[in-house]
Amino acid sequence: MNNDFLVLKNITKSFGKSVVIDNLNLSIKRGSMVTLLGPSGCGKTTVLRLVAGLESPTEGEIFIDGEDVTKSSIQNRDICIVFQSYALFPHMSIGDNVGYGLKMQGVGSDERKQRVKEALELVDLAGFEDRYVDQISGGQQQRVALARALVLKPKVLLFDEPLSNLDANLRRSMREKIRELQQRLNITSLYVTHDQTEAFAVSDEVIVMNKGKIMQKAPAKELYKYPNSLFLASFMGESSIFNGYLAQGTVTINDYQFVLPDADKFALNDGECLVGIRPEAVKLKSEGMEEQRCVIKSAVYMGNYWEIITNWGGKDLLVNATPENFSQEMKEAYVHLTESGVFLLNKEE
């Protein structure tokens, strides 16, 4: 299995007649962070529960560091989970919460105290040992939950939507802390979220799931730039989809032609295709050819940019423009496309 540390082979999971995971194959390299991303009900949390040993697969095998753990209990998998709900004991001090797993393993008091101290220092909570859960903030509670997992030094660390209960600013700081610690400690990690920004921020690779299947696995930048289906294109950020034509690297939309230098990376034959345009790929200018002309339908000020809906060739085209490049007085403009943010899909999609 080479450097593959966590491997799922031909995994199927059914509940009654309902198949929620359909012949899934997945491998994670030692020391990497991979995120399962997808809409509600796609199967991502079920995969995490299968890895943890909280569910058993109907078919297939699970390996950790080369060992078949398919039938092993959660206690025998050397795995820790950071939950969305934190799952802290309110009647225990922070130190006792973090050291609870060590105590259950029979680790002596002196060693336990030292390891708890080190774990709290890792999550920037040095000196919090004697406080209680109701004396700290939600963000601090999540860091306590993270310290409780790290103190056990697991082979695999699982994250089950750990930031869902935090506000936007805390989510940002916590995902940075999680990524920093995961890289510093080199812990193989599997992360579950429905939040694209979160997935992009913490991951070496992102796996997008839908209806119990893996749709695409790649680094975040590649997923966004080269989606392999309409589902991926719509799920990984906003885009406008147009009918187009590809001929030797030149793309035609509404009689407007432009060269796409990396067209070969989409592995399409010349001919009809679908062209996806991200909002940031569009520049609205005051001059252009007739086939570039669009009509401004609406514009909403979002703070650092304008979110604009235009009509181009009879279809809506979403545009994000900076305040310097757009005025509310504009009724018409001309579409200029940049190569970054334009992608191609098979017409059959």
Curated annotation (Swiss-Prot):
InterPro entries: AAA+_ATPase (IPR003593), ABC_SmlMolc_Importer (IPR050093), ABC_transporter-like_ATP-bd (IPR003439), ABC_transporter-like_CS (IPR017871), ABC_transpr_FbpC (IPR015853), Mo/tungstate-bd_C_term_dom (IPR008995), P-loop_NTPase (IPR027417), Transp-assoc_OB_typ2 (IPR013611). CDD domains: ABC_Carb_Solutes_like. It catalyses: Fe(3+)(out) + ATP + H2O = Fe(3+)(in) + ADP + phosphate + H(+). Its EC number is 7.2.2.7. It is a peripheral membrane protein. The keyword Transit peptide does not apply. The complex is composed of two ATP-binding proteins (FbpC), two transmembrane proteins (FbpB) and a solute-binding protein (FbpA). ATP binds at residues 38-45. One of its GO terms (molecular function) is ATP binding. It is an enzyme of class 7 (translocase). It is found in: Cell inner membrane. Belongs to the ABC transporter superfamily. Fe(3+) ion importer (TC 3.A.1.10) family. PROSITE patterns: ABC_TRANSPORTER_1, ABC_TRANSPORTER_2, FBPC. GO terms for cellular component: ATP-binding cassette (ABC) transporter complex. Keywords: ATP-binding, Cell inner membrane, Cell membrane, Ion transport, Iron, Iron transport, Membrane, Nucleotide-binding, Translocase, Transport. It comes from Histophilus somni (strain 129Pt). Residues 6-236 form the ABC transporter domain. It comes from the Bacteria. Transmembrane segments: none annotated. The keyword S-adenosyl-L-methionine does not apply. This is Fe(3+) ions import ATP-binding protein FbpC. Part of the ABC transporter complex FbpABC involved in Fe(3+) ions import. Responsible for energy coupling to the transport system.
